[in-house]
C-alpha cells in the first residue's frame, strides 16, 4: 500500500488529486488534521511517513516544503510538485510523460517530478513535435492565444465567477509575462519568447491552446496535412503505450468545445487548415484541472510508484 501525503490538500488541485487517488485500491492518502494545517511538526510527521508527497502550494511554500523534506532523516519520500517552482530546475524531471520517447521512463525513475502548468502542457504538446520535425524553426515568432475555465485562477477567481461578479470573458496577463512562458521555451527549444495571450471564460473547467500559422512563412511551406503527420508520428508510440495525448482529424463542423474533455486526463490535438489561404491553426484541447493539473499529477504518481 503506497502512502501519499498531499501538502495543500484543501486547494482546487489538491482536492481533485485526492478524489482521483480515492479510486485507486493500492493507495492510502495521509491527511492532516484541519486544525493542524499550519503546524510544521504535524506536516513533517506526515511527510516522513509517506512514500510520496504531492505539493499543491504557491511557489514559495513549495520551496519551503522541499527544504523540509530534505531535512528528514533516513529515506526521503518522492515528490510531485504542482507549483511552478521547479519546472525548469535541472534536478527535477518534467512531468509530461508524452513529451519525448524516453520521458515516461524518466518520470518512472525520478525522485522529484515537476508537474507542468496547464497552458504549458497544451503549448508544449503542439510546439515540441513541430520543432523536432523541423517544420517550425526554434526562432519562429510564435503566438499562442488561449482560453481556460475560471477554475484555473484559484479560489478567489472561482468565487467571483460563481457569485456573478466576473465578466463572461476576460483577457488577462496582458503584461505578457505569464509564468508558464519559461517552461514553454525550456521544453520546446524556442529561442524567441512566444507571444502568449491567455483568457478566461465563464465556464468552470476546460482549455484550448491555439497556434495560428501562416503556412507560407514556414520553411518548406508545409501543408496542414504535413503538420498533422508530424504530430501523429511524435505521439504514436506514447499513445500505443497508454499515453493520454491523441492527434485527431479536424472536426467536420470546424468547431471545438473547450469543455469536452472535462474530468479526464486526455489531451487532443487537431490541425484546422485553409489550404487556399495557406492558413492553419493547431489546437490542443484539455481539462485545465485534468491533464493540466490533477490528472497529470496522478499519472506521474502512478509511474513513480509503479501502480
What is the predicted function of each stretch?
Residues 12-44, 56, 141-146, 150-282:
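C-terminal substrate-binding/catalytic lobe of Rossmann-fold NAD(P)-dependent oxidoreductases
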Residues 135-136, 190, 307:
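Helix N-cap/coil-helix junction residues
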